């Protein structure tokens, strides 16, 4: 995988992507602003508590890797940072507004269903319907320069499958684990087997009731 981010690096990039769209008047961000964004109690899963020193180290590393760049001058004595992760002049990763919203939300909140993504990403991009969200996810999962997202097996009792991003360095291991845990049968096969078993149980119960009735006579 080309993009090998740690969880903390993913949080920093996600925050810069988010603030670039939602609060452009405050962008680029200072170190203090990045710390505040990383440690937000809302719209973050998991909630982190990164120190200024930790964030500065992350920023320096990401600048060296050309995922961020520093911005100074024009009367600003404080160094600020802007993302070059996607849609930058010389970068390879080009994303639509909908793709940026989905990727950012996944970076900040982990695996989510299409419904959750549509609701949580609406400040960055207003999806017209669920079909648009699913189309964006499908595109990110099948890109020639990707894949950038993957669908997880549906959890028991859940109507929707969750999707995860593939930008972190431990994702290959996670995908292997998920595939090993995936059910061998799809939902339709499992449902058919359950219905067949329920029918057999009902038939056995009826035969038992009939037998008990005859014994009672």
Curated annotation (Swiss-Prot):
It comes from Klebsiella pneumoniae (strain 342). It holds the Pfam family DUF480. InterPro entries: DUF480 (IPR007432), WH-like_DNA-bd_sf (IPR036388), WH_DNA-bd_sf (IPR036390). Belongs to the UPF0502 family. Coiled coil: none annotated. It comes from the Bacteria. This is UPF0502 protein KPK_3478.
